[in-house]
Amino acid sequence: MAAITLLRSASLPGLSDALARDAAAVQHVCSSYLPNNKEKKRRWILCSLKYACLGVDPAPGEIARTSPVYSSLTVTPAGEAVISSEQKVYDVVLKQAALLKRHLRPQPHTIPIVPKDLDLPRNGLKQAYHRCGEICEEYAKTFYLGTMLMTEDRRRAIWAIYVWCRRTDELVDGPNASHITPSALDRWEKRLDDLFTGRPYDMLDAALSDTISKFPIDIQPFRDMIEGMRSDLRKTRYKNFDELYMYCYYVAGTVGLMSVPVMGIAPESKATTESVYSAALALGIANQLTNILRDVGEDARRGRIYLPQDELAEAGLSDEDIFNGVVTNKWRSFMKRQIKRARMFFEEAERGVTELSQASRWPVWASLLLYRQILDEIEANDYNNFTKRAYVGKAKKLLALPVAYGRSLLMPYSLRNSQK
């Protein structure tokens, strides 16, 4: 699930030398070769363009459910109604959920397509997955520990997804980022297309290619993540939260959509597939918003401001205030509003975590609890995210692990709700 968005954190160190060379090789080596009307009405009543709502009121006799669509429409300065980013992303969610539901239906036995074009040595796939696990352990220790409770197939698949996402992220955030161009990302996307058709370029690609032959994973979230990297190359400001939401989906929400088919839904869950995907998306958005709020000063030093420009203006703040990095009452008030929004996304995500397969819940809960604590640390720093970097200490991380494990044993929320 979106807990794997730990890989998107700007705080993570660079890749090992070997993996960094892989990122640089992209440029050199690769160059060689809408819902029904009734629901719309309720959505307009409950939701705003500024803050996420926690769900849609259930109709009589229905189980309460969450929805990621906080406003299905937004209005331009000219007064024209356009589809919001939330609605666009929700359309992707529906597609992913439909794919998983088709996969869960009884199917005639077929032999999966295994990557053939890569000349792997004997036990090559085993070695490829092992290397993916090593990378995950090195850069996301807490999450890696949680994956050890999963079945072997699921564990290895999550490692493979993690590594692809990390390599993609390193293209624009890693040591070779200054050499990456839009055409390099185009070549990376071509390489993605190849591995989805069983033609991986290297050992790490082969692990992901094998994974997608075993699970109903769609290529769209992967393409969308690459689009997020393109956005980082050309865009340094976001006019409003609608724009920022789309960016957060591209670089973090996508990971949740990639991961749900692997992590699986608990057989006893009464939640809809769509609601589980929606919660995975919400966790990705929450984690990325947390990254943004933690890294305001660091991003400003790179000339980037990942904050809604219209909300900054409403708070009486400007880009100059961000670059000056002085904590004022205006800044504190603005940050309280941003933190509130991020917490609302975390709250929406919580219900969905309980619906996952029990063996998959621990790493997701661990990520959720640890990332949410970063918001507490920002508050503890008196909202100084210009010169102080909020982080969760080792002691708090260790304390969070048993709490996360305990929550992973809880009955799915949908089952508890249906018994009331």
Curated annotation (Swiss-Prot):
Domain of life: Eukaryota
Compartment(s) of residence: Plastid, Chloroplast membrane; Plastid, Chloroplast, Plastoglobule
InterPro entries reported for this sequence: Isoprenoid_synthase_dom_sf, Squ/phyt_synthse, Squalene/phytoene_synthase_CS, Trans_IPPS_bact-type, Trans_IPPS_HH
Residues annotated as signal peptide: none
Enzyme class: transferase
Matches recorded under SUPFAM superfamilies: Terpenoid synthases
Catalytic activity from the UniProt record: 2 (2E,6E,10E)-geranylgeranyl diphosphate = 15-cis-phytoene + 2 diphosphate
Transit peptide extent on chain: 1-70
Family that this chain belongs to: Belongs to the phytoene/squalene synthase family.
Protein name according to UniProt: Phytoene synthase 1, chloroplastic
Originating species: Oryza sativa subsp. japonica (Rice)
